[in-house]
Amino acid sequence: MKISILGAGSFGTAIAIALSAHGISVNLWGRDHRNITHINTYRKNLKYLPTYHLPDNIYATSNIDEVLSDNNTCIILTIPTQQLRTICTQIQHKQHMCKNTPILICSKGIEITSLKFPSEIAEEILQYNPIFILSGPSFAKEIAEHLPCSIVLAGDNKELGESLIETISNDVLKIIYHQDIIGVQIGAALKNIIAIACGIIAGKNLGNNAVATVITKGMNEIKTLYIAKNHSIDLHTLIGPSCLGDLILTCTTEHSRNMAFGLEIGKGRNINTLIDHNLKLVEGTSTVKPLISLAKKLNVELPICISIYNLLHENISLDKAISNILS
């Protein structure tokens, strides 16, 4: 059995470690040829997870044809949302190699140009591949340490989804199936912005009560966008791992890049400098613009999210943003 993972960053590497530890051969693709060479030579991803050993049944490559040409059980995409269209197009050009292969997407956010969620981008391009979203509270380092997490595999094909879960679920990746593919992605996108807000509150030393208030209000904003986008609501999604679970994890620990980013803002660091240094790592900064555009399109109000947008992009004062977040 072989699975290919496109994206050799922290999360892709961690997933590769978790799968390979349970006997699955993994192809791991990344763009950085030097880092890929280090992985195969030293069995460590020196750029992203330098302290974790990669088992011998992980083969890394910077040649995307190599990972698409094998008979994969599935292909897992662990790449930023803004790069997803390019990667899906590359897969589409190799359809003779991987037609009908299930695609599992771990990307979180909204595409800036189209205002589409990751599954919508993939379904537009990969019309012959079953599309699933793999999402939930899951820090890469904990997965690499073989610590358990509960995540969701969401998609329209229940029979195939449950079959995939039997293949990839183990004592580290505890996976449940859900058909609500859009609802899962709404929670995944908004939680990063809410986490920035929680970090700001914590950085200003406004207390745990205020952080809890922001999490509660943030959950309501997830529900608001969820209803506007889906025209209905599934409580199993809203209070499950991909929404409530991921929101709690991302908003309550400095191990979260988004909360850590907000903490630095709350402590008075220059916002533009922080954005320049963290743009590729902090998903909330790239999600907030298309999110606000989508909210306007759907005619919904998201007070916390618009406050973070105004703080990052419209130069409102930190005190004003905090007042709006807590009001």
From Swiss-Prot:
Gene Ontology terms: biological process:
carbohydrate metabolic process; glycerol-3-phosphate biosynthetic process; glycerol-3-phosphate catabolic process; glycerophospholipid metabolic process; phospholipid biosynthetic process
Q: What is its EC number?
A: 1.1.1.94
Q: Kindly state which keywords UniProt assigns to this record, in alphabetical order.
A: Cytoplasm, Lipid biosynthesis, Lipid metabolism, NAD, NADP, Nucleotide-binding, Oxidoreductase, Phospholipid biosynthesis, Phospholipid metabolism
Its protein name is Glycerol-3-phosphate dehydrogenase [NAD(P)+]
| Pathway in which this enzyme or protein is active | Membrane lipid metabolism; glycerophospholipid metabolism
Question: Which HAMAP family does the entry link to?
Answer: NAD_Glyc3P_dehydrog (MF_00394)
Coiled coil segments of this chain: none
- Detail which positions bind NADPH: S10, F11, R31, K108, A140, R257, L281, E283
Q: What does this protein do?
A: Catalyzes the reduction of the glycolytic intermediate dihydroxyacetone phosphate (DHAP) to sn-glycerol 3-phosphate (G3P), the key precursor for phospholipid synthesis.
Q: Which residues bind sn-glycerol 3-phosphate?
A: K108, G136, S138, K191, D246, S256, R257, N258
Q: What subcellular locations does the record give?
A: Cytoplasm
Q: Which Gene3D superfamilies has this protein been placed in?
A: N-(1-d-carboxylethyl)-l-norvaline Dehydrogenase, domain 2, NAD(P)-binding Rossmann-like Domain
GO terms, molecular function: glycerol-3-phosphate dehydrogenase [NAD(P)+] activity; NAD binding
Q: Which SUPFAM superfamilies match?
A: 6-phosphogluconate dehydrogenase C-terminal domain-like, NAD(P)-binding Rossmann-fold domains
NAD: present as a keyword of the record?
Answer: yes
